[in-house]
Amino acid sequence: MKRRNFLKAGTGAAGLLGGALSPSLASAMAAARPKLVDTAPVEAISKGKPQHWLGPAFWGNRLQDWQSNQGRLECLQGGKSFEVRTAALLTRTLNNAHKPARIRARVGLLTPGSTGFCGFLLGVGAGKLEYRGAALAQRSSGQNGGFMALLNTEGELSFRDFSSPENTLAFTKIEREGSVGIDQIGDREIQLDCHIDPIDKGRFDVRLIASDINSGKEFGFAVYNDVPAEILRGGISLVSSPNSDEDGARWWFSAVESGGEKIDIHPEHGLGQVMGCMHSLNCAPEEPVLKLSAQFMPIDTTALPAARLEYRNENNKTWVTGADAPIGDGYVAAFRIVGWDAQRDHQYRIVDPGTGQSLYEGTIHRDPGNQSPLKIALYSCIIPTAKSLDETEFKNHIPEERVLGRYTEDNIFFPHTKLVTHCDSHQPDLYVFAGDQYYETFPTRYGRDTPQAKLDTLYRWYLWYWTFRDSVRNRPAIVLVDDHDVLQGNLWGNKGDATGGPREEDGGFKHDIDLVKMVYRIQSSHTPDAYDPTPIQHGIPVTYAHFVYGGTSFAMVEDRKFKSAPDYEANRLTVKGELLGRRQEQFLRDWAEMDPGLPKICLTASIWGSPQTDEEGNGLIDYDANCYPPDGRTRAVKLVEDAKALVLAGDQHLGLVARQYSGDFPVDQEQASGALFFSGPASAAFWQRWFEGFGKLENQYGDDPNTGNFTDPFGNNMRVLATANPKITHADFSDDNTSWGKFVSDRELKSEGYGIAVVDHAAGHYRLECWPWDADPQRDRQFTGWPQVHPIESLQQS
């Protein structure tokens, strides 16, 4: 039926837009509709036991809000303030073709008697978000959010806006040409069928039809006419929701199907049972060791309790069975192989031991040795969104910030495509993630003290993994656990002793110890063996370690696990305490004697000092920065100085190079004494720090006014050699700041990105690079002050 006749029939019967049409007329109109688009299943939903992995084609927001159960996707969250729970269709996207499309599913209520709605969310991102970013849409409407085609518990079929940046939980009904309701849903099972039909002038009509699942008889429908093409592009999600600001309905879905040329199908976008793998190689000459972890999705581990690692070298067609490992807490299988042949490339795969099916594959490259420069990528501090998607109103922290569209790249950073692509273009040999792989309130609210805390943490972790899975699939990665990784804003680990009180500053780990142990399991199962694996209190594992890779000797240390709780009453210049703790201090003494003749690099979470200033250039007191306690910090700096090591770190959200001293400034100001630290910039963070010297500091480096000799408020001396300050000055920020913190959401006001450290054995120097996230290394410039070249002091010593 042509649109003009369809409209004529509708208005003749109802008389008014939005009026109900008679069932007999609805049937007549249905018979006159154009030929239906054929559909095919999006994904066969598991008929097994409940699991929070919904299958390769679906991504649930959040993990704990959905499960697959005996052939259905079931929403588990219908509480107040949990509107619009979504399950994104990862493998389906609305394209810009002027062609028909169709999406259908069987739906039903899990909570008869409650109120709410279900249906389809269409056009997330308006075709401007990468499919993974579009998959995060949930709760609140906002720019480029699309619209929803819905059935509510009263049987009303409607279309509701999901693109308004104001009153974001209103979900305003869109005026439509006609509809027929189907009465209360109750315990009925309904076929919900959404048709997208092209009409004149590049526009579309969208029909939502409710039918009997057995006979196919239509119960009712709604029509949204003359839909602009630009809002019918982007992501597609299933929706289950209570009414706004109420406890309410939870829905189930099954037999989800799609069809039509307006829907692109991308099976490669699916997420299988394995999210990814990470590995490390310790190529110490006595006994090379491979460690590899396979991160599974939240699967039913009674159906797949274990995984197998198989591998083969470049000259062998036969797969070798490495080991079987249980899929343990955090859905991780951990493997360790002693005597690894590090001189050959190997393919690896993760296999289901029961069926022999390969679940995930990658490459373990040979040790690059010292025949070519070793390239190290340095990341830290990364959030998936500029603002939490649970915030119903986005407010600027300062007037200079742009208004961020909720479902635009200004707010949805994930999956950080430019950042990752630009860093990977350097072809790093080793990836170092220096901590804060996720944060407690991004992309959603706190979940750390809820019964679903583990799943909530995994939701954040999976977003990090999904970002970097292809980077680390074929290259070794070192991951350091920092404070936000264990869901604390600050951490004074105090060897695990939390008896001082409930506050973070009382010391110890403040959240469920089993959750903390899971964090170390998911992030550290693949890292080199601990130097002394004796756990701290409560059985919390340690991860400080030594390894050799790329002709370089590495030490990993944990600079918060043993750190003393702050004593705010004591004199901050003379207070005594631990930073690394005696065990790690002894480790660094031992490391200084290991691997003679190799470059030495120490990997740690945070720079051991507090190079940060206020609006006038005065040092800021920050007990969280590892300037405290000063005596523990001084011992730590002296140990890496004695080892002639370069230190790579993150945490401070401020790209910086500094020479740190364990005592007074050297008499010869140009002498390369002290320990060299490179703290990479945040990859994407909300809290900002500055180091502004205003040209007033002695011994500036390269005539940069933001460099020179600096003594922090704890008496620690350092020479700052480069800084990547935010693009807005501290003074301008403070003049207009409306919050208690130093929050900036607009990336255009920040200096974020990644670091590259190159170990050039032949030239005998380190090359330190610091890149903006959006800079193309083939044509763009680094942050001011980089690159820097410094001698490999351990080679000079040998």
What are these regions (language model features)?
Residues 5-30:
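N-terminal export signals
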Residues 327-336:
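Aromatic sugar-binding surface patches on proteins
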Residues 162-191:
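Short, aromatic/His-centered strand-loop micro-motif at the edge of beta-sheets
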Residues 77-167:
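Secretory/extracellular carbohydrate-interaction modules
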Residues 32-101, 108-110:
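Low-complexity, Ser/Thr/Pro/Gly-rich disordered linker/stalk regions
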Residues 105, 183-223:
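Carbohydrate-binding surfaces in secreted/extracellular proteins
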Residues 245-248, 257-259, 270-273, 285-287, ...:
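Long, structured stretches of catalytic cores involved in phosphate-ester chemistry, encompassing
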Residues 218-249:
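Flexible glycan-contacting loops in extracellular carbohydrate-active proteins
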